Structure formats: C-alpha cells, structure tokens
UniProtKB/Swiss-Prot annotation:
Compositional bias per record (Polar residues), positions renumbered to this chain: 171-189
Protein name per UniProt: dCTP deaminase, dUMP-forming
Record's subunit section: Homotrimer.
GO biological process: dUMP biosynthetic process; dUTP biosynthetic process; nucleobase-containing small molecule interconversion
Length: 189
C-alpha cells in the first residue's frame, strides 16, 4: 500500500521514518521530494579498459564537489553518481521507491538507471544514477529537487531488514554518492 501525505507525516512524527533535514513543504500527496546533495562521482574513462562487476576497481570514479554556489554540469550522454541531501532511514515495515521528477525528465535528466528500490531497514543517503539523454548540457544545482520518494507499507515487518547481518547490506550508512560494491557478492559460475 502506497502511503499518503497524511501517513508520511504520521510516520515522521512517530519517528519511525526519518528524512534529515526534513522540510514539511516537500511532502507531496503520495511521496516526499528529495533534494540533490553537492557531491558527485564522475567516471575515470582512462583508468581501466572496461568495467568488471566482479572486480574491485577503486579508481573507476573520482569524487567531485562544485564550488559553493556553483552547479555541476552534466553533459549529453554522461553518467555520474550523485546522492540525496537527505539522510533517509526506513523502519522494517516500509520500503521506498525513488522516482524522477517529471519536470526534469522532460529536460532529458534520468534520476536512476535501475536502482530505484530502497529496502526496509535502510539508513543512508540514497545514491542517484544520473544520466543526461538530452542534446544539451544540464546544470545540476545542489539543493534542487531531484526526485520523489514513494513509501510502501509491507504486509508484515521484514524478517531480515536491510542492515541485518543475514542480508549482507553493502550500502548501509552510506554518505554521499557511493560507488558500486558489486564485487563483494559477485558469484562466478
């Protein structure tokens, strides 16, 4: 069941759901807007001959932070990692779904490639997979609305929420745009 604005506010008031910093003006009828943080991870296209999900490739990306008051420019065809300004903490019976903002999609900005689902129990800044599919550069301003978080109530609390030892939660507590850790649980057959 998708939570309404009333339910979102009740979960935050009960301190079961946390988005810090919280701004009540960001609550929408069935979602809450999230804003863009100021850190980005850009890909180093000359460090490796290819990307291998089975390998740890520490120099695949570089952390970039625009100067105060300046935007990050995302060029056509470029893919970078960003993150939400908000630290998001979900209880064991709520899952999240990150969706892009329609107004930004109409400009050619994709907010996430595939990883729009947030497990119950997750706590951290949500990493964004930002792509420019337009023919012109797009300026990304720190603090701008970048997506909307929809919240879904589970039929019962998760037995092993994200962050529990049984799950192997590679991104719990992440701060800023976090590079892939796919190598940690990659299985070669």
């Amino acid at each position: 069941m998708l939570l309404s604005d009333r339910d979102i506010r009740a979960e935050i008031a009960a301190k079961r759901l946390a988005l810090e910093p919280f701004d009540d003006a960001l609550v929408q009828p069935s979602s809450i807007d999230v804003r863009l943080d100021r850190m980005f991870r850009v890909f180093n296209n000359t460090r490796y001959t290819h990307i291998d999900p089975a390998m740890q490739q520490d120099e695949l990306t570089t952390l970039v932070e625009p100067a105060e008051g300046e935007p990050f420019v995302l060029h056509p065809g470029e893919f970078v990692l960003g993150s939400t300004l908000e630290l998001c903490t979900l209880p064991d019976d709520l899952a999240g779904r990150l969706e892009g903002k329609s107004s930004l999609g109409r400009l050619g900005l994709l907010t996430h490639s595939t990883a729009g689902f947030i497990d119950p129990g997750f706590s951290g800044h949500i990493t964004l997979e930002l792509s420019n599919v337009a023919n012109l550069p797009i300026t990304l301003w720190p603090g701008m609305k970048i997506g909307q978080l929809c919240l879904l109530r589970l039929t019962s609390p998760a037995e092993n929420p994200y962050g529990s030892a049984a799950v192997g939660s590679k991104y719990q507590g992440q701060r800023g745009p976090t590079p892939s850790r796919s190598h940690l649980n990659f299985i070669k057959s």
